[in-house]
């Protein structure tokens, strides 16, 4: 974190094999978002030293770190007040990020052009918490790093998780401990107007069709400690907008009487056929009203197309 270019690990190599040392090194890199951009890490052939190459010179690196730390303190001071529950803290942090950070699609496309191994200099900040918190734009790594720093400052136990999106594109998200239970939170994919907060406090099972974990983010032996098996604090459930499939059409119709756009949730494993059945019921009740609708991970969005 202090821009060290050489780290002596000889004391550890005497007691641990290289697999465990590599595992620990990967965890340290993943879970320390104040490390603002590493271009290369190498372990010496004799296993006694780690060499690190940074994207920025030491002066720039330290300046960016200071800016991030100051911004984190400023944000948390404005958001968190005494007596807030852990869930309340998480939700205000999450809301702040969705309102103040935009996804940097250009940075992602640039990384794709480089086989996802690097990005051109102009885009590199977007892969860090600096891009998210200072520049206001980032890709998933920046979102995940920013969430960790803010949640840490607010006193919430949390981690960054690495893996892929639907088994393809590399992706990063978070898990957070709320009242003793771990939950999946993906601010990047929640920052959308179509299916907002679809990945806010899900279980591993509910998120598994979209978020595929690898083992890079934490020491392998500890992965099970972060299992998310609970949905009590799932966003739509806590907001009173989660309904059984046999009730949801009625609820959508009721909300459409006073709203132009409705977002509600039902079973995460809802199929296309089940969604079509629900919408047939809604359209039958709405008569001639023209509707647009879609779903993702059980979140249904219905919009009145004729609304002015």
Task: Annotate each language-model stretch with its function.
Residues 114-118, 127, 138, 149, ...:
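Extracytoplasmic/periplasmic C-terminal soluble domains
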Residues 57-132:
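Secondary-structure boundary elements
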Residues 181-278, 292:
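His-Asp-centered catalytic microenvironments across diverse enzyme cores
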Residues 68, 89, 139, 143, ...:
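Hydrophobic (often cysteine-bearing) scaffold residues that line and stabilize catalytic clefts
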Residues 63, 135-138, 162-165:
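Alpha-helix capping and helix-loop boundary segments enriched in small/acidic/polar residues
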């Amino acid at each position: 974190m202090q821009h060290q270019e050489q780290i002596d690990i000889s004391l550890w190599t005497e007691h641990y094999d290289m697999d465990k040392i590599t595992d620990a090194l990967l965890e340290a890199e993943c879970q320390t978002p104040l490390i603002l951009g590493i271009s290369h890490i190498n372990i010496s052939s004799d296993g006694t030293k780690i060499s690190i190459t940074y994207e920025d010179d030491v002066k720039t690196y330290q300046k960016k770190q200071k800016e991030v730390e100051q911004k984190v303190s400023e944000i948390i001071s404005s958001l968190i007040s005494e007596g807030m529950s852990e869930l309340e803290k998480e939700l205000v942090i999450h809301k702040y990020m969705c309102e103040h950070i935009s996804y940097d699609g250009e940075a992602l496309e640039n990384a794709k052009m480089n086989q996802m191994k690097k990005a051109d200099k102009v885009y590199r900040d977007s892969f860090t918490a600096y891009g998210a918190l200072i520049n206001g734009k980032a890709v998933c790594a920046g979102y995940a790093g920013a969430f960790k720093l803010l949640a840490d400052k607010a006193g919430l136990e949390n981690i960054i998780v690495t893996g892929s999106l639907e088994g393809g594109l590399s992706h990063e998200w978070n898990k957070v401990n709320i009242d003793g239970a771990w939950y999946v939170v993906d601010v990047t994919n929640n920052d959308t107007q179509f299916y907002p907060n679809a990945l806010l406090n899900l279980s591993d099972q509910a998120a598994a069709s979209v978020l595929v974990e690898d083992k890079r983010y934490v020491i392998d032996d500890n992965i099970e400690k972060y299992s998310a098996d609970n949905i009590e604090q799932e966003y739509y459930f806590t907001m009173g907008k989660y309904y059984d499939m046999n009730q949801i059409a009625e609820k959508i119709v009721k909300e459409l009487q006073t709203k132009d756009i409705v977002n509600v949730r039902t079973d995460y494993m809802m199929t296309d056929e089940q969604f079509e059945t629900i919408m047939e019921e809604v359209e039958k009740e709405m008569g001639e009203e023209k509707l647009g609708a879609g779903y993702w991970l059980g979140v249904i969005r219905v919009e009145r197309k004729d609304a002015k």
